[in-house]
C-alpha cells in the first residue's frame, strides 16, 4: 500500500466530536457495535439484491450473499465482511467522514441529555459504534463501479483513503478491520461472538458466518520417509480389485496427531419461523420457538401466526402463555414481551407502543417490512406504522381469545390466568370494549357452580327485564347473602357476582352490553315494576312518611335521605349510594390504597340513602314506636342508630366508630343475660357515647322493641 497514493481528509467537526465521545465512553453494553455493523451489512446486501432484480449481472462479481465474521486473535483484529453493494471512493469519503449526517448532532445532544448509547442506530450513525471497542479501523470496500479502496482512521481528526493494491480482492462488498482495545478482546472469542449474534442478529435474512479455528485429530505416517513413500505409491496405478488380504496387512503404520483447521460456521441457520408458511410448521416447532424467546419451560396455551400485506407489510407469531407472570401488574415490570424486527434485523423487545399494557402477557415476534432500520433498536418512538401494527395485533389476539373460548377447559385455564388483563382492556380500550366484554365470565344467582358469560345471561333474561344486574363485593360469600338480592330474586332476575377489585373499574367503562344497560344494584336504580306495584309503593310512601322524616332527623348528615324501599324483602333496611359516586365496594378498595388522594375520596364517596322495608316487622314496630313516643325518644334514637349501623355492615360498608356499635351490642347481650346492674353495664363499656346515656336503662326498652 506504500506505493499507492494516500489521500488524507479531515472529519467534519461534528463527526470528530462524536467519535471522541464514543471512544471515551464508559457505557457498559458495548456489544451493540456488532449488531449495528451486521445491520449495516444487511442493508448493503439488501441494496445489491434489489439492484440484481433488474440487472442480474450485478451479482456476477460475487454471487454469494453473506456476512462473515473473522477473528484474528494474533493481530487483535476483528474482521466483519459482507458481499453487499460496497462503496466507491466517493462513498467512503462522503459517507464516512466529510458529509455530516443529520443525526450526528442530534445523537450527541441526546447523549448529553442522558440517552443510551445503544440508541445510536436511531440517528443513522451506527457505523461509529465500532469505536466503543476499537481505537483504529480499516474499511476495505469494492463497488461494482469502482476499484477497491481502503478507508482508515484512528478516531483522530483525520482519515485516509487509498487505492487498495495489497489486500485480498473482495470481488464486491466491504470488510471492516477493527483493531480492538486491550480491554475489549473478548469480542475475538468464538463464544462471545455467538452470544451477541444470537441475542441481536439471529434472524437477519442473510447467512452470518463465523470463521472458527478447531483442533482436530488426524492420522499421519509414523516417519517422513514413509510419508514420502506413500505419496509416491499413490501416484502409481492401482489394481484394487486384485488386492488380497496379505497386501492389506502390509499397509503402513500411522499415528494420531492434533492440528488446527479453519472452518466457516453459520450462526443463523434457523431461518425465521415467521417467514415460513404456517401449514408447514409443526406444533413442536412452535413450542420450541416459544420456549427460546420466552424462557418459559411450558408449552404455550395458543399461538397466532399471521401476516398482513398491502400498503403495510408485516409478519407475526404471537403466543398466549399458560400462566400469568408473577409480576404481571407491577409498575416497574416491562410492559412488552414482543421482539420487534425490521426486515429480520432485531430492533427492540421493549417497544411499549407496539402493544397495549393489557396485552403485556403476550409473547412473540413481529417483523415489519416498512419500519426504517435507522430507528432506535432499543427505544422505538411512536409512529403511524407502529400504530397500524398495534391495531392489527390487538384484533388478532381478540380473535385468538375467542378461538380459545370454544374449548371450555382451555378457556378456564386462560381466564384464571388473564381475566384481569381482559378487564383492564375493557377499562382502557374503548374501540374493542364490546368484543372483550364477550370474554367476561362471572358467577351469578343462577350460575353458582359454573361461570356464565354476559351473552348467556342475556339469553336467560325474562321478557320484562330491561337491564343486566350485578352486585360488587369482597367475596362470593359476602355478596350471595346481600339484602340487595331479595327483590331481584323475587322477580326471577339474575344478578352477576363481581368480586374482583378490577370488576368495578371495568364496569364503569363498559356501561352496556348488547344494548342492555349494566346496573350495580348496590347503587340507586329503577327496578322494573307493574302498575299495581307502583300504586302500592306510592301508598306505602305516604303511610311511612312520618317515620322516614323522623329517621332522617335522628341520623342527620350521615344520610342524604331516608326512603321507603320496594327493593328490599326480608332485610329491614339497607344503605344505597348514588348512581355516580363510589359503591360500598369501591369505597373499601379506595380506602385500601396507601397513596390515595383523600380529596378525591371525600368527593366520590357519595351521600348514602337509608332504605327501609315496609314489609319488615322491625320497621312496622319502629313506626308504631315513633307514632307513640316521638322521634326524640331515647329508645327510638338508640334503635335507629343500631339499625343504621347494621344496615351499613350488611350493605358492604365499614363503620367509622365500631366501638360505639360494639357498645350497643354488648348492652343487648347483657340484657339477654339478665344483667341490668349499672356497675356491670359500666364494666362492659366504661365510656358513655353520644347516642346512649348510662344513667337510664335504655337497653331494656331497646330489647323490648327488638323482640
From Swiss-Prot:
Residue positions annotated to bind ATP are 40, 82, 101, 127, 377
CDD domains of this UniProt entry? HATPase_Hsp90-like
Asked whether the UniProt record includes Nucleotide-binding among its keywords, one would answer: yes
Enumerate the residue ranges of region (Disordered): 216-257, 676-707
Q: Give the location of motif TPR repeat-binding in residue numbers.
A: 703-707
Which top-rank group of organisms is this from? Eukaryota
Question: Transmembrane region positions?
Answer: none
The cross-references to Pfam families, in alphabetical order and at most eight, read: HATPase_c_3, HSP90
Biased composition, class Acidic residues, residue ranges: 222-232
Chief subcellular location: cytoplasm
Which HAMAP family does this one have? Answer: HSP90
| Domain statement | The TPR repeat-binding motif mediates interaction with TPR repeat-containing proteins.
Its biological purpose is as follows: Molecular chaperone that promotes the maturation, structural maintenance and proper regulation of specific target proteins involved for instance in cell cycle control and signal transduction. Undergoes a functional cycle that is linked to its ATPase activity. This cycle probably induces conformational changes in the client proteins, thereby causing their activation. Interacts dynamically with various co-chaperones that modulate its substrate recognition, ATPase cycle and chaperone function.
What's this protein's name? Heat shock protein 90 homolog
Name the species this protein comes from: Candida albicans (strain SC5314 / ATCC MYA-2876)
